[in-house]
């Protein structure tokens, strides 16, 4: 039973009812985990940069990826830590490579997502595809058309996003667990990546498809809830908690329990977020 989260340095004990968890203590836990993840990310990228090919295009692209990866609340990474603490009763502290890799996966997904959504900013920064297009226009002047500049920006951003996906696996490899556990982490991580992409496919194609709530409500509702489950529930809650539990040595029963708790919770979160987006004012 979960009663409260009691933190001492990086150890968290869970022993009370969820409704009784001290909110401030949990927020402090998230903030402390974010600091740990941010520091580890800088270290990992510094190490990785030593092996990067000597090419200015690649190194500039890596810097763009690092810049886009900085900041953020690191909630998913913190949930990986929480999953590990639950599974190991606060005894294991191997979560950081998985958390850093997962946060890089999120950054890479968002780089691609910004192209799909035609977003111009992300975390207060100009998105990579927009920034790349602007810079090539500035450097080439009248020598490049708007269309070609936009195509270049999108192409470069796609490459950088792909680069981030593959680097994230190298970060996971730093996890100091035995090979059997690491293999399970890789397997689950790959599953989460695939399911997130499946959700993105449905989310991208559905608005342009002839299926609508008016024509076939049941089919439309099913697809909307698939998006909720794949893009939010798995990617934001279930996946991180399950990865942490696997890292902490949790058995299949615990991992499955976390999944069964997190998926409906994540779905409910996305429904509420959508409702706020539709009905709330800017002041809310």
What is each stretch, according to the model?
Residues 1-102, 107, 111-150, 200-222, ...:
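Conserved N-terminal diphosphate/IPP-binding helix and adjacent helical/loop segment
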Residues 44-55, 67-76, 155-167, 171-282:
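All-alpha helical catalytic cores of prenyl diphosphate-utilizing isoprenoid enzymes
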């Amino acid at each position: 039973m979960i009663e409260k989260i009691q933190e001492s340095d990086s150890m968290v004990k869970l022993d009370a009812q969820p409704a009784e968890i001290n909110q401030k203590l949990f927020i402090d836990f998230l903030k402390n985990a974010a600091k740990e993840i941010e520091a580890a990310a800088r270290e990992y990228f510094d190490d990785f940069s030593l092996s990067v090919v000597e090419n200015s295009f690649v190194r500039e692209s890596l810097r763009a990826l690092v810049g886009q990866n900085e900041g953020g609340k690191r909630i998913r990474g913190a949930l990986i830590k929480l999953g590990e603490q639950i599974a190991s009763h606060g005894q294991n502290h191997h979560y950081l490579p998985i958390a850093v890799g997962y946060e890089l996966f999120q950054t890479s997904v968002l780089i691609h997502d910004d192209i799909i959504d035609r977003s111009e900013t992300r975390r207060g920064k100009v998105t990579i595809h927009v920034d790349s297009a602007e810079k090539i226009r500035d450097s080439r002047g009248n020598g490049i058309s708007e269309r070609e500049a936009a195509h270049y920006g999108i192409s470069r951003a796609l490459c950088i996003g792909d680069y981030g996906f593959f680097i994230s696996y190298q970060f996971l490899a730093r996890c100091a667990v035995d090979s059997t556990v690491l293999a399970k982490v890789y397997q689950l991580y790959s599953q989460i990546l695939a399911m997130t992409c499946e959700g993105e496919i449905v989310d991208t194609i559905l608005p342009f498809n002839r299926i609508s709530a008016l024509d076939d409500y049941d089919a439309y509702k099913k697809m909307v809830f698939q998006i909720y489950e794949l893009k939010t529930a798995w990617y934001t809650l279930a996946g991180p908690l399950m990865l942490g539990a696997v890292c902490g040595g949790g058995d299949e029963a615990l991992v499955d329990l976390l999944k069964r708790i997190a998926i409906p919770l994540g779905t409910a979160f996305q429904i509420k977020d959508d409702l706020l987006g539709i009905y709330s004012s800017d002041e809310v």
